[in-house]
Amino acid sequence: MSEKRVEKKLIHYVKKALNDYHMINTGDRVMVCLSGGKDSYTLLSLLNSIRIEGNYKFDIFAFVLDQSQPGWDDSALRGWLDDKKIPYEILTRDTYSIVKEKIPAGKTYCSLCSRLRRGIIYRYAEEQGFSKIALGHHRDDLIQTLLMSVFYNGQIRSMPPKLLSDNKRHVLIRPLAYCQERDIIKYAMEQQFPLIPCNLCGSQKNLMRQRVKRLISDLAKENPKVPSNMLRALSNIKPSQLMDHELWNFRELNVD
């Protein structure tokens, strides 16, 4: 697939997500969380292209959180943002030391790291008056999270494309919800984004997400529709076919 075709495909799916879930309103100030990885770079680049087109009237701002991880170097990232003329701020908060101190060796850091990062993001967005917080999760993240929740937490849940935070003060959006990771990888390579590796997560083996990712990949080899069917399932819930006592009073569920 050519460079333009990949970009066109991704923009199509981002616009579809924006429209399907009413993610961005006219005049919104959208804070895009830029981690330095392929997904967040792709999100920021595509939203910037859509903004420049002019059919969607909104402003974007790149928020970068330097968590003081070993080897962090944001000089190329700064250069890329300056070149694109995208306003940004890089905020330094040493969450790395906290995670290393609190989590035993060999255990996954993702949960605590995510909580600390989320608190900082929410606080910054509120202080600066941003109306939307955009995250770079894509289709594969959504379906992997669904299986992880089922297998390891006993819950049917995932990452919604649009979410009101628990404190009711923030709206999170995931414009890449329909985008496949393989297309994002191609796009990131073509754009030559100056990626910053996550040395905290990347050093850990056998993470649950990687195991689930392999499982979905194996199933897709037998039936290529498996990933798209899983995504469709997230918007095709049949509560009457489940076992949740909060949805149904089974004692009183009888013929009149």
Swiss-Prot record:
GO terms of molecular function: 4 iron, 4 sulfur cluster binding; ATP binding; magnesium ion binding; sulfurtransferase activity; tRNA binding
Compartments, as annotated in UniProt: Cytoplasm
Catalytic activity: cytidine(32) in tRNA + S-sulfanyl-L-cysteinyl-[cysteine desulfurase] + AH2 + ATP = 2-thiocytidine(32) in tRNA + L-cysteinyl-[cysteine desulfurase] + A + AMP + diphosphate + H(+)
EC number: 2.8.1.-
Name the record gives this protein: tRNA-cytidine(32) 2-sulfurtransferase
Its biological purpose: Catalyzes the ATP-dependent 2-thiolation of cytidine in position 32 of tRNA, to form 2-thiocytidine (s(2)C32). The sulfur atoms are provided by the cysteine/cysteine desulfurase (IscS) system.
Cleavable signal peptide: none
The protein's annotated pathway: tRNA modification
Cofactor, free-text remark: Binds 1 [4Fe-4S] cluster per subunit. The cluster is chelated by three Cys residues, the fourth Fe has a free coordination site that may bind a sulfur atom transferred from the persulfide of IscS.
InterPro entries in alphabetical order: Rossmann-like_a/b/a_fold, TilS/TtcA_N, tRNA_Cyd_32_2_STrfase, tRNA_thiolation_TtcA_Ctu1
Motif PP-loop motif per UniProt: ranges: 35-40
More info: The thiolation reaction likely consists of two steps: a first activation step by ATP to form an adenylated intermediate of the target base of tRNA, and a second nucleophilic substitution step of the sulfur (S) atom supplied by the hydrosulfide attached to the Fe-S cluster.
GO terms for biological process, alphabetical: tRNA thio-modification
Cofactors required: Mg(2+); [4Fe-4S] cluster
UniProt-listed CDD domains: TtcA-like (cd24138)
Entry keyword set: 4Fe-4S, ATP-binding, Cytoplasm, Iron, Iron-sulfur, Magnesium, Metal-binding, Nucleotide-binding, RNA-binding, Transferase, tRNA processing, tRNA-binding
Residues where [4Fe-4S] cluster binds: C110, C113, C201
Coarse class of the protein's main subcellular location: cytoplasm
Source species, domain of life: Bacteria
UniProt similarity note: Belongs to the TtcA family.
